Amino acid sequence: MIVCIAEKPSVAKDIADVLGAKTKHDGYIEGNGYQVTWTFGHLCTLKEPHDYTPNWKNWSLGSLPMIPPRFGIKLIEDKGIEKQFKIIESLMQKADGIINCGDAGQEGELIQRWVMQKAGAKCPVKRLWISSLTEESIREGFSRLQDQDAFKSLYEAGLCRAIGDWLLGMNATRLYTMKYRSGNSRQILSIGRVQTPTLALVVNRQKEIENFKPEQYWELKTVYRDTTFSYTKGKFTKIEDGQALLEEIRPLNFVITDVTRKEGKDYAPRLFDLTSLQVECNRKYGYSADDTLKTIQSLYEKKITTYPRVDTTFLSDDIYPKCPGILKGLKDYAQFTAPLEGIRLPKTKRVFDNSKVTDHHAIIPTGVYPNNLTPQERAVFDLIARRFIAVFYPDCLYAQTTVLGKAGRAEFKTTGREILKPGWRVLFDKEKQEDKQDDEERILPQFTVDESGPHAPELQEKWTTPPKPYTEATLLRAMETAGKLVNDEELRDAMKENGIGRPSTRAAIIETLYKRGYMRKEKKNLYPTPTGTGLIDLIHEELLKSAELTGIWEKHLREIERGQYQPAQFMDELKQMVTTLVHDVLSDNSSRL
């Protein structure tokens, strides 16, 4: 008998249907030589400190650092979990073979490996690796099962991540709580490898806002033929300098000195990875990162979209032949897919690039018709569907006109933009109107060199503005790029290696900061609470709050996943870091409160 183990009951049912397993038992489905069972996400977890030695049960500075000689796992204490595990254990003990059907990612690999280890599974194990839950995808996956050994590095990276989080979280939380909490306070100062640098980003931004001192400046503009031109030499920090130039040029004619027209093109937006989808949903609809993750997970389980926990915006070449069929399935978008029928779809490196795809490709529709969706599911699906269609549309062609002029010695400039062929933009016309992006197209009057006439100059008073508070959208981007502000897509791809956390965990980190009372949300804006600010002020060690240092850890974990970095080396470095941290904090006699 072959035992298949999935990550949740609904996925197990989809797999059982494809395999022809029809007989339902308590905790599994059987038939056609298969027993299909399931977990409920994590059934096992790393042991707690007191599971290793009674000396680590009570919190004390003398017991730090806590570094077990060998890490172990245990069942999560829950009656439902214990019951399901006994069923899984019984099936695996008698199995001729096991097929790991867990989510195709690092966390999914860890969940199932721990269960198999705890169950004492001894038979050969194969791995099902699929990017969607459609019948076609499941059948295709079972036709090319892989040996579990091929995913050893993925498991090792997940294990190192879990142990790293345990070592730093357990030791640093006890260390700071016992060393610095005041008097008889029972407050726990919770510190985490990812949550603390993320909180530091929000705290530091708030301090920048509070410490910001607005500075006054003036900009010189002039209006000629109902068109506003800007002075090219920048702003004035002294009003008298700007006023003097204004008075000098007021009586003079404005002369057009140069007119340049260049044609260019805008490419369609990239397909979504999880973070960019969360960013767009927060920007457009105000959905939290956690809400978006739950929604896209639901769409995946309904077989409507592909695997969501991805960090690439590209497709692999093997998806290309399936694209016409997916487009055909988008029946509600027939007005947009009709022009693509019967033509050879374009295949560009901006969309199809095997070198940019590792475990999974970008999030796209599967072609299954979306029935019975909630309004939120419908809104998220709409974003994904339109992006997918758009990448096969022609580029948007535009003409940019730059006009230079002068009045006396003062030089001015204005630019205009005219859409020549909208191309892919036709899919987003409604969105453009809703977002009031009326500056997208600015058509200038016809200007000719050497024409001249009266103009109306004015000096506009301005003030420098403070940085904006983070929203979930901008915080996700900052986590992705380790705190660096990056707008360019290509640079964003390069920075992903060093981001804080993983796409699949960032929403949970943000939710943790809310739940622990370290951060609050006001409308879309995020603010640290006094408790959150106090915690970051308390931490002097850059190791704990530096986004860049945490990003380097993430890079090593990704290298372990690719077999380019030794897990043992990572663990040795981690243990040394924790030991040094404990020593430094215990040696600190200053008052940080």
Residue spans of the language-model regions?
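OB-fold/S1-family RNA-binding modules
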Residues: P49, K94-I99, T227-T237, G242-I249, ...
